[in-house]
């Protein structure tokens, strides 16, 4: 099999969520954070030929970048990963699947309680402003008929009362109120446009970012509130 630049870019992104990955035969990849706060999945154009666990995904991708784009990836007789181009061959150790935290199957997302969108340029601004202003927490809430993201520094403002950044996403025609809290450390998605689905029931809640190339599900923080 061969991995295109688009697939390797996705895998590099997934490595920011979990340093290891379990690749399974087919055209679907997925991962989740060790603490379970973030899940990501994607359909890819390449076909994965065999099941294999990779403990150090960034290390594997780094080695893969050193060979030609036409390098062939296969499974060696001893179960490890063989990377070969016209002149060189590299053997990368496969991991014991039990050492890699990975989802057993795709995680279904419930029917959304609220839906909006976040544009690529807005997501990029949010991430950049958050770094510049030390914003570690965002709250997705309703204000005057609009769905709004507010940014806070929870370390210095544990009650989240001092807004450091605000971004209006779109109109909200529902009657419910909510204040969904997300840790910025879990915002690992690739740059792009996303449909944002918000769900909550009781003390549980999650936000799903549906993109052109990948989907991400992020758990809401325990101090989130809603009346759904």
UniProtKB/Swiss-Prot annotation:
Record key words, sorted: DNA replication, Viral DNA replication, Viral transcription
Transit peptide listed as a keyword: no
Annotated GO biological process: bidirectional double-stranded viral DNA replication; DNA replication; viral DNA genome replication; viral transcription
Molecular-function GO term, any one: DNA polymerase processivity factor activity
Keyword Protein biosynthesis: no
Function: Sliding clamp that encircles the genomic DNA and links the DNA polymerase to the template to control the processivity of DNA synthesis. Responsible for tethering the catalytic subunit of DNA polymerase to DNA during high-speed replication. Interaction with the sliding-clamp-loader opens the sliding clamp so that it can be loaded around the DNA template. During transcription, encircles the DNA and tethers host RNA polymerase (RNAP) to it.
Similarity field: Belongs to the Tevenvirinae sliding clamp family.
HAMAP family: Sliding_clamp_T4 (MF_04161)
Subunit and interaction comment: Homotrimer. Interacts with the viral DNA polymerase; this interaction constitutes the polymerase holoenzyme. Interacts with the sliding-clamp-loader; this interaction allows the sliding-clamp-loader to open the sliding clamp. Interacts with the viral DNA ligase. Part of the replicase complex that includes the DNA polymerase, the polymerase clamp, the clamp loader complex, the single-stranded DNA binding protein, the primase, the helicase and the helicase assembly factor. Interacts with the viral RNA polymerase (RNAP).
Descriptive protein name: Sliding clamp
Natural source organism: Enterobacteria phage T4 (Bacteriophage T4)
Originating gene: 45
């Amino acid at each position: 099999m061969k991995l295109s630049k688009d697939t390797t870019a996705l895998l590099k992104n997934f490595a920011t969520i979990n340093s290891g990955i379990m690749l399974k035969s087919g055209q679907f990849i997925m991962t989740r954070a060790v603490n379970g706060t973030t899940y990501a999945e994607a359909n890819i154009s390449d076909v994965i030929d065999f099941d294999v666990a990779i403990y150090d995904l960034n290390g594997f991708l780094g080695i893969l970048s050193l060979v030609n784009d036409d390098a062939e990836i296969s499974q060696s007789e001893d179960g490890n990963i063989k990377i070969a181009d016209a002149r060189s061959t590299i053997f990368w150790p496969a991991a014991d699947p039990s050492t890699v935290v990975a989802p057993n199957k795709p995680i279904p997302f419930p029917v959304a309680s609220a839906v909006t969108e976040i544009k690529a340029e807005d997501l990029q601004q949010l991430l950049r402003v958050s770094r510049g202003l030390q914003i570690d927490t965002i709250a997705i809430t309703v204000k005057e008929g609009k769905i709004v993201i507010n940014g806070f520094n929870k370390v210095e403002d544990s009650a989240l009362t001092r807004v450091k950044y605000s971004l209006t996403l779109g109109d909200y025609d529902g009657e419910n109120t909510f204040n969904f809290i997300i840790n910025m450390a879990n915002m690992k998605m690739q740059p792009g446009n996303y449909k944002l689905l918000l769900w909550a029931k009781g003390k549980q809640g999650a936000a799903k970012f549906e993109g052109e190339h990948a989907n991400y599900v992020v758990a809401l923080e325990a101090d989130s509130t809603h009346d759904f």
